[in-house]
């Protein structure tokens, strides 16, 4: 017999017992009823106390009867307080048990779903699959590296030798340029006409010669 069956007397010849939800609802209704009874008794106690005070000096017999009724009401109130504590404890225990039952039910449902999901899975197959994936990734990386690597189509050159040859060519060109602008004495000048030039022509020629010399000086300074 289940725990709930033992609690509520289910599983016997009387038939199926109440569900936890039904029992919890009944306990809450009982708590509400007892709470109303508490309010009623507290009002009765206050009323009897008022009667006892009112008749304390005038009618002692009535005052004593009121105090006796007050004591009975107080006793009933104490009993209800104890009953409420017991019912509250029982309801909380039942609610916790019901919560645990729902949690376990959902966990079992999830476990079955996980088992179903893993039915067609085998750890060895998973390991093999992961190994295949790793190998394919490595192969893809090797292919990418091979494609991106410069290809000489059978011609392989030493980069250092090529750089040295390029530097030699650059030095030769530089030396050649320096020889061409080594100085004004190496630059052939135009022939001077033997016939006297007009004054204006002589001045223009002199100015042009000075400009040429200035240009040569700038080239020489740049070369150095």
From Swiss-Prot:
Residues 1-21, 182-224 are annotated as: Disordered. The keyword Coiled coil applies. The lineage of its organism: Eukaryota, Metazoa, Chordata, Craniata, Vertebrata. Keywords: Coiled coil, Cytoplasm, Endosome, Membrane, Protein transport, Transport. Gene3D superfamilies: 6.10.250.1710, ESAT-6-like. The keyword rRNA processing does not apply. It is a peripheral membrane protein. Residues 7-17 have a biased composition (Gly residues). Probable core component of the endosomal sorting required for transport complex III (ESCRT-III) which is involved in multivesicular bodies (MVBs) formation and sorting of endosomal cargo proteins into MVBs. MVBs contain intraluminal vesicles (ILVs) that are generated by invagination and scission from the limiting membrane of the endosome and mostly are delivered to lysosomes enabling degradation of membrane proteins, such as stimulated growth factor receptors, lysosomal enzymes and lipids. One of its GO terms (biological process) is negative regulation of cytokinesis. Residues 21-221 form a coiled coil. Probable core component of the endosomal sorting required for transport complex III (ESCRT-III). ESCRT-III components are thought to multimerize to form a flat lattice on the perimeter membrane of the endosome. It comes from the Eukaryota. This is Charged multivesicular body protein 4c. One of its GO terms (cellular component) is cytosol. Belongs to the SNF7 family. PANTHER family: CHARGED MULTIVESICULAR BODY PROTEIN, CHARGED MULTIVESICULAR BODY PROTEIN 4B. Pfam families: Snf7. Its main location: cytoplasm. It is found in: Cytoplasm, Cytosol; Late endosome membrane.
